[in-house]
């Protein structure tokens, strides 16, 4: 506000200029009072003329004055005492300066119309506060300052008008709540008006400065009170006051209306843009009033200036005011699908999807399921043949392969004793009856047993938890429910002696036992080839042993000869006569036999005559050859074998000796 003081001066300067302008404003005020009186008397005719010309009334343009008048009363109540004192001082100055009683009478006579006119302008200023606060403020202030500059008003008149002036000042307080930029723009708009004189512009600037200095601290305190009292405090003006206000507004010159029309439109848009941050309730009321004002302004072309489009482009319209709390004004999220009404698809009401019903006629299948239904999970040792038994199409089960049921479990080989079968046959009368190889027997103690052929199985009953087991009948591609199982049955073999139990145990044993891959068969007879080889080996061992014995005996005899002379050695012919028929060996004969015998034996072994003769000769020659090879080994031999060899050698020696003796005799 420092700029405002530099431009328009201080309060002291404005008081001095006001005293100077009092004298010159008397004549103007007289004319205005006369015009206002005449206009007040003929208000009804003017109202009809304005209705015919199509110009909307202030009530139609700006809504009911009662909405914002309560707020102006409340906002201006705090400064009532201060301003009343200022007004009383101004009235005292005017009383001292004006001493002419005729002027006092003249002004007292025009007191009622002036008061009415002032009240009309001030009430209109309060009503314009909601829509066009700035425009009516300028217009009402011009007239107010033009009338209040009169120095001939009495103290009573000033005191009576003080309350009405405070209402207009309350409307000015709302305008001063806006930012400094809005005030500067308003001041520049007021300065650019060419129709206003310099005195009027100076008065307007002084008024704005005074109001800003006096009411600025109060405006911030009354913001919350105005917002809270908008809905509570309603207009207190009666219908007569409204009519009087409208009649007081009409006598203004048409030139002044055209002159201030541009200012009014600009002030409307400024006030609307400045009040964009008000509460949601005020914004909604602004929208309703602007809608009414826009309708009335569209009807009257005379009220809209030519440069209204430029003003709309500069400040925007009432439709541009947006409340931050309205979710409908928010733009849709980028990337979110939007329907034809501009709303996101997730905000649309979800329409229920109609159900698709297809009417199909299906025959109802009724089956006699009996009184009790039981759910049975067959063990691997029981099976059921669903088809009736027919000997023509019966196929025996495979014994070498294990059968797999529909559930993939390994079952025992299906035999007659563990498969439930049934058939249809005719009785003696020719009626068809059903027979089965199984039956369930219920005993007196409540227990049950299943008799399947010669096998007996114990049946145990247990309840089923939950409704998860149902009986369905397949019908085409669909299933038709028949019943719900509540009880289940389990089967167990009655004893371990049953054939079924034995099959179970045998099957388990077969799975666990390991088969021997290699089998050894016992030999029934002996192989002749193997026997021959064994006999050859034994014979060779015996020959080797005999050869070893002979060599050993020879060494023993040689040792005995080397010990000394003996009787047989010294007298070899002593017993010849006595032992003619007995065997006798001389030393010379032994030497000759030994020397010649070796040569002959060697010759015999390697001669061609060895092939001739018996097998015994061959065996003897073989033994002799082996003895010659084993002389050097010197292995000991058994005593018994040595005696046998000695006997054989003695016999041979005897034979050899006898041959030599015969040759000698010859």
UniProtKB/Swiss-Prot annotation:
Q: Which residues carry this modification: Phosphotyrosine?
A: 606
Cellular location(s): Nucleus
Residues with PTM N-acetylalanine = 2
- Which Pfam families does the UniProt record give? Leo1
Q: Where is the composition biased (Acidic residues)?
A: 1-14, 179-192, 574-583
Residue positions, PTM Phosphothreonine: 188, 629
Q: Where is the composition biased (Basic and acidic residues)?
A: 70-96, 119-178, 193-218, 239-285, 547-561, 636-648
- Keyword Phosphoprotein in the entry? The reply is yes
Low complexity compositional bias: what residue ranges? 32-44, 316-325
Could you give the subunit structure recorded for this chain? Component of the PAF1 complex, which consists of CDC73, PAF1, LEO1, CTR9, RTF1 and SKIC8. The PAF1 complex interacts with PHF5A. Interacts with TCEA1, SUPT5H and CTNNB1. Interacts with SETD5.
For this entry, the protein name equals RNA polymerase-associated protein LEO1
The scientific name of the source species is Pongo abelii
Lineage of source species: Eukaryota, Metazoa, Chordata, Craniata, Vertebrata
């Amino acid at each position: 506000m420092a700029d405002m003081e530099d431009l328009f001066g201080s309060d002291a300067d404005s008081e001095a200029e006001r005293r100077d302008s009092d004298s010159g404003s008397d004549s103007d005020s007289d004319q205005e009072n006369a015009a206002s009186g005449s206009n007040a008397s003929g208000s009804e005719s003017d109202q009809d003329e304005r209705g015919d010309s199509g110009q909307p009334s202030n009530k139609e343009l700006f809504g009911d004055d009662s909405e914002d008048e309560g707020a102006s009363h409340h906002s201006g109540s705090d400064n009532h005492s201060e301003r009343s004192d200022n007004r009383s001082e101004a009235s005292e100055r005017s009383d001292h300066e004006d001493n002419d009683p005729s002027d006092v009478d003249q002004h007292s006579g025009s007191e009622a119309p002036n008061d009415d006119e002032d009240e009309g302008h001030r009430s209109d200023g309060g009503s314009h506060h909601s829509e066009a606060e700035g425009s009516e403020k300028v217009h009402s202030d011009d007239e107010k300052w033009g009338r209040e500059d009169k120095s001939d008003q009495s103290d009573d008149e000033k005191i009576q008008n003080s309350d009405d002036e405070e209402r207009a000042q309350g409307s000015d307080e709302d305008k001063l709540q806006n930012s400094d930029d809005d005030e500067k723009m308003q001041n520049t708009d007021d300065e650019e008006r060419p129709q206003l004189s310099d005195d009027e512009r100076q008065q307007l600037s002084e008024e704005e400065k005074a109001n800003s200095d006096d009411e600025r601290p109060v405006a911030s305190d009354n913001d919350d009170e105005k917002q809270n009292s908008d809905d509570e405090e309603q207009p207190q003006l009666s219908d007569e006051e409204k009519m009087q206000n409208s009649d007081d507004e009409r006598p203004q010159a048409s030139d002044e209306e055209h002159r201030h029309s541009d200012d009014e439109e600009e002030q409307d848009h400024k006030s609307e843009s400045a009040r964009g941050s008000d509460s949601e309730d005020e914004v909604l009321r602004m929208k309703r009033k602007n809608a009414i004002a826009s309708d009335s302004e569209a009807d009257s072309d005379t009220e809209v200036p030519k440069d209204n489009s430029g003003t709309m482009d500069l400040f925007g319209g009432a439709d541009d005011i947006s409340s931050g709390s309205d979710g409908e004004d928010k733009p849709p999220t980028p990337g979110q699908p939007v329907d034809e009404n501009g709303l996101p698809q997730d905000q649309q009401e979800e329409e229920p999807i109609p159900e698709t019903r297809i009417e199909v006629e299906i025959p109802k299948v009724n089956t006699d399921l009996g009184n009790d239904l039981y759910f049975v999970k067959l063990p691997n040792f029981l099976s059921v043949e669903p088809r009736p038994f027919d000997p023509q199409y019966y196929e025996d089960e495979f014994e070498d392969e294990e059968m797999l049921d529909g559930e993939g479990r390994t079952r025992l080989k299906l035999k007659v004793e563990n498969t439930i079968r049934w058939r249809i046959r005719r009785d003696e009368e020719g009626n068809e009856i059903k027979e089965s190889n199984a039956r369930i027997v219920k005993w007196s103690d409540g227990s049950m047993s299943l008799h399947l052929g010669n096998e007996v199985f114990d049946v145990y009953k247990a309840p089923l938890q939950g409704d998860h087991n149902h009986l369905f009948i397949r019908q085409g591609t669909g299933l038709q429910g028949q019943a719900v199982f509540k009880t289940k049955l389990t089967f167990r073999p009655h004893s371990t002696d049953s054939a079924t139990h034995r099959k179970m145990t045998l099957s388990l044993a077969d799975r666990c036992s390991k088969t021997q891959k290699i089998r050894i068969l016992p030999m029934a007879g002996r192989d002749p080839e193997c026997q021959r080889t064994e006999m050859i080996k034994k014979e060779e061992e015996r020959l080797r042993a005999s050869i070893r014995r002979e060599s050993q005996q020879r060494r023993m005899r040689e040792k005995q000869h080397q010990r000394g002379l003996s009787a047989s050695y010294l007298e070899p012919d002593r017993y010849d006569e006595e032992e003619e028929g007995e065997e006798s060996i001389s030393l010379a004969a032994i030497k000759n036999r030994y020397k010649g015998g070796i040569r002959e034996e060697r010759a015999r072994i390697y001669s061609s005559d060895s092939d001739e003769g018996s097998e015994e000769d061959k065996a003897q020659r073989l033994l002799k050859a082996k003895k010659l090879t084993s002389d050097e080994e010197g292995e000991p031999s058994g005593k018994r074998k040595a005696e046998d060899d000695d006997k054989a050698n003695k016999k041979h020696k005897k034979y050899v000796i006898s041959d030599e003796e015969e040759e000698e005799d010859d």
